[in-house]
Structures are given as structure tokens and as C-alpha cells.
Amino acid sequence: MAKKRVLGVVGMGHVGAHVAYALAIQGIADELVLVDQNEQKLASEVQDLRDAVAYMPHRVTVRGGDFSDLSVCDVIINSVGKIDLLRGTHDRLTEMDFTIPAVRGYAEKIKASGFDGVLINITNPCDIVTRELALHLGLPRGRVFGTGTGLDTSRLLSALARQTGIDHKSITCYMMGEHGNQQFAPWSCVSFRGMPLDTWAARDERFRFDRDALQKESIGGGWVTFSGKFCTEYGIATTAARMAYAVLHDEKVILPASAELTGEYGEAGLFAGVPCVIGASGVEEVVELPLTDEEKATFHACCEGIRHNMEHLKEI
């Protein structure tokens, strides 16, 4: 009999509820363990998901629980946040004064449960919170990572597909750096159907687009979504679900994520968005792209920005 795949979701707000639904509807989980401090909200989400299961193509068990119940999980997705803090601002750091104390509080509870799987963090500021979780959980390197620039890369893929008419599955690109305003697209590593962007641009005008404009669109995509509905849900939920699938199936697939750097790209002591090999042990390798000198300088600047923001941890 195949081993039952158990996934936990911590935080059942807009994002957490959509993560749970994505895991269920795609058949990624056999069992979902949902945790939230608001017991009535938790009960409501559990009931709603159970009501949906009968019409799903996969059998999924959904139950509410507390942090002690997370011990049985293969993967936990952390999505605790306070989205209302972002109203009137375009800076994910605004959430930091809420999310860091919250994470410090419940990370110890997750650790006390005996959890020994992989944790994927969504909570913002993603790179800083992911590092905080890794420090408190004490799991082996790679077993705690964040969605990071995974969602931003999806936005870039979408923009490139619309611009060129090439299906997004035939495009290779990454957003790197901070999951926030300090990120960039290394254009030298972008390819379509296996050929570099510059090769295409030399022969087809569709590929002679304004690269700065598309990068800006990718960075600002979340705020376009937020401005009309005051949350983001579908994109980040499917990003996290894709990463969970990669872990459960030991895919060894390259995906952009917030990973610990210990010398890669000449950086250390922080988490940042980089291409990673993701498998059963979480981030199993940080892929070092052959960046140009200009792109290397840009990445270092992004990392300096993350370090600067980490200084605020001393005040929390």
C-alpha cells in the first residue's frame, strides 16, 4: 500500500484556504491537517473543503487540528499573515512587525510536535520569515524554504508568453533576489524553446520588447491583484502546491524559491530567491546560473537590501 501523503497548512486566511483547496483539487494530498488560531474560521474552512471533496476526482481527508497534530505531516505550508496591514502600501515589510513575533511563537510549537518533514513558507516578508523559521525549527539545511520569487517568476512567464505567443511551458526564465521590490530578471538566462532570448530577438521583432517594462510588470503584478481584491490567492496557492508536489514526488525539478545561501553567488547568511533543485529533502541544491557581471552586481544589491531589512529584526 502506498504511503499516505499528509500535508499541513498553518493559517487559514485567504491564502491558506486557497492553498488547501489547490492541494485537494490537484490530488497532491491524501490528508490535509489545517491549523488556525481562529477556531470558528478553521471549522468553517474544514467544512467547506469537506463539502467539495465529493465532487473532486481524488479522495482527500480534511481535518482541523492544532500544532501537535502537525507531527504526522510530510510537508507543512506556512501562510500566517495579516493582509490588512498592506492596505495603502506597496511594501511587504509592513507585515514584519506582526509576522515575526507570530512565527517565533508557533515555530517552537511545530518543533515540539516532532515534525520532521519539509516546511514551505509563504508568509511575508518571505525571505526574512523563512530564515527565521529555519533558525527556530533547526531542521537540516534545505528542509525549510520559501515560495520566494516563485510567484514572481510565474508573473514573468505569463508576461513573456503574452508578449511573444510562445507557450509558457516552452519558456525558461527566473526572477531572482527578494520576494519584494528588490528583485530582477536575469535576461541572459531567458530562453524560448531552448534558444536564448538574444538569438530570437535578432530574427523576430516579437522578442525585441522593453525588458525593463516586463520586469516592472512582474514585480508589480501582486499589487495589481491586491488593489482590486485586497489579497492575492490563486497565484500563490498554486505556487506553493507546485513546490509541495515536487517534494512529495522527489522530482529534482528546478524551481525558483527562497533558499539559504552559503556561498552560492558569493552570498551567505541569508535567504533569497534563486533557482533550486527541489526534491524529497526540500531544496537539495542551489543552481548557480551563469550571470553576466551586471546581473551579478544586481543580485548582490538585492541581497544587500534583504540584509538591510533584516536589521529590523533586532527591534522586534
Task: Give names to the regions the model predicted.
Residues 136-143, 152-316:
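C-terminal substrate-binding/catalytic lobe of Rossmann-fold NAD(P)-dependent dehydrogenases
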Residues 37-74, 307-316:
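Conserved N-terminal Rossmann-fold NAD(P) cofactor-binding segment
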Residues 16-17:
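N-terminal Rossmann-fold NAD(P) dinucleotide-binding loop
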Residues 8-9, 34:
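Hydrophobic Val/Ile/Leu positions in short beta-strands of Rossmann-like dinucleotide-binding domains
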Residues 53-75, 79-90, 98-114:
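A structured beta-alpha segment of the ubiquitous adenosine-cofactor-binding alpha/beta core
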Residues 90-157:
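Rossmann-like NAD(P)(H) cofactor-binding subdomain of soluble oxidoreductases
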